[in-house]
Amino acid sequence: MENKFFLRLSFLAFAFLPFVLTAQSRKDRHLSSAEVLGVRADASVASAAPVQKLDTASIRRMGVTSTADALRRFAGVNLRDYGGAGGLKTVSVRGLGAQHTAVVYDGVTVSNAQQGQIDLGRFSLDRLAGVELHTADEGNLLVPVRQLGAATVVLRSWQPNAQNRGMHGAVALRHGSFGVWNPSVLLSQNWNGRTAVNVSADYYHGNNAYPFTVKNGVATHREKRLNSQMNDWTLEANAHHLLRRGQLSGKVFYVTNHRYLPGPVTLYVSGNNEHLTEQNAFVQLRWEQQYGRWNFFGAGKADWRESKYLDIAGRYPGGRLDQRYKQGEIYASAGASYVWQTLTAAVATDWFRNDLTSNLKVDNDVWRTSWLTSMTLRYAPRHFELTGRLVSSIFRNHATAGTEAAKNASQLSPSLSASWKLMSDQRAHLFVRAHYKEFFRVPTFTENYYYHLGNTHLKPERTQQLGAGVTFAGMLSARWQVQLTADGYVNRVWDKISSIPYNLFVWRTVNLGKVRAAGLDVALHSTWTLRNGQQLIGNGTYTYQRVTDRTDKTSEDYGKQLAYTPLHSGAVSMAWENPWVNAVVSMTAASKRWATNEHTVTTSVPAYADVNLGLYRTFRFRSFQLEARADLTNLFNHQYEVIRRYPMPGRAYRFSALLRW
């Protein structure tokens, strides 16, 4: 199976080779006088910490079909996907775990104090103008402290343009296999050239009853994925006001989601009767202002979240398990920076309060107050940049009478990053970088308080990150532009929070374990400009991750790869843009994984390669623009699993039309 996986990977790579050779073999390199030779190094190229970005053009050219799929194209990302639209989708970066990945939506962090991880399937790709991944340290100095995670996913929605006068809008309709329908609408209005508002609505429905094959020895049987239906409504409003040397933005967001949770497939039993209904609403404001050498920002957010979990099964008293949770958060952040020649100093502070209530008799109300402060200093002469940051974190836990509150926590977390510009001219840029960072996370409410599982005596999970890398961006010829990034790293985790069996029926969450992650991330972007308005855009990422248990040398699991962490993974895409119909072929792949830390035949999860094909074109008439697209996913109808016993969909189609004015 491993050999077949790498044969497919090699075949697709060689399939792209003729396009590359065609672009390089053209001897006529003459350019018109209007063309300018050169490449500009943007902030991500010169950053002292790795930054990966996708804008709407890149998303279109790479055949990306969802927000989770976009993140899967980044190097160093390990996506956990339980299959179908209703399956949970979270990301772990460089082996540190999903709880160490912060998610930022339009400048303010998205939180879930109960679970500690964000389901990225809830963010529709249609509402996003860009997706970024910041690994290790944040390149921007003046940011809320809360987004300074071990890794940060930055999501940017379409913002109203205060300088684009009049009424503008967009309507879209998407339809796909397995009963997927996804209409959406966005309206934007500018009143006076300084103030603009947009309102959007999005509905998603999917039956997700896709077929799959069950194997039992030599016998096979075809089944359909059951209990995977999802309905999702999202409403969002954004306001943007231009100030003199500043801006003020606000967001109101509401989503309600009802999904059936598909259970694991065990031989011929795939039925499940679990339901999850979630509601989330928040209001956030962000202010930015510049006064001479000073820059200021302020942000605030009020967040409410409710989830209702229902499992109908005979093993429960009364035949059902009904759990209801409510979360609330109040959040405030402010900061300032001062620039003096080659020195920049910044300070920011965050305060937030999270609370959780439930209908469980064994639980009482619990809440946590947090105060984070960061102090940053950057020295940036012409060809060198050195940034040091110190983060102070204080967490105080509280509970109503009768419930023991979790342990309080406080810590200082330093980080240091540097970037050197070895070469920079009109045609090429070469940067090298290095970083060191310490970070920790406090236990989630579930890890602290959940019945039979929680432990109020848990210590924070601590991490240490060390890495170095190089980025080259340049014009290799008059028509060939390349950007290549390579980063190596070693990460360590102490006091890792894990759940272990306490007896035959009860599990317990404890600080048990040390983890070491050593890896290599490589990313390549290349553009070949051809004749007659044609170009080839190639993208590729490769990740090597050796993430092992380093807890007990006498244990059988010592030195073994952690569960659901492939040793090799990657993605590749090639788009051909032309005056007729644009085409893109893409592939994501991962080597063999293990469902647990015990490496046996029964816990092995085979390697996979998922190939997609897309066609798209934009039509323009008067002030209207129509984008039409057709995608075929899992082209070879390969059945695979990202999570064991949760089969992914086979071959599927997807049609979409987007009208803008």
Language model feature labels by segment:
Residues A23-R60, A68, A98:
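Short, acidic, small-residue-rich periplasmic hinge/interaction motif at the N-terminus
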Residues A68, R72-N112:
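Extracytoplasmic beta-strand/coil segments of soluble accessory domains associated
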Residues F123-A170:
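A beta-strand signature from Gram-negative outer-membrane beta-barrel systems
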Residues N208-F212, H221-D232, R245-F296, G300-E329, ...:
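Flexible loop and strand-edge segments within Gram-negative outer membrane beta-barrel domains
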Residues F297-D311, V432-K437, E461-A518, A523-T527, ...:
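Membrane-embedded beta-barrel scaffold of Gram-negative outer-membrane proteins
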Residues T342, A380-L386, Q483, D487-R492, ...:
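Gram-negative outer-membrane beta-barrel transporters
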Residues I394-A399, A406, W420-G467, G488-V510, ...:
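Surface-exposed extracellular loop regions of Gram-negative outer-membrane beta-barrel proteins
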Residues G538, A589-T596, S604, L615-W661:
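C-terminal beta-signal and adjacent terminal beta-strands/loops
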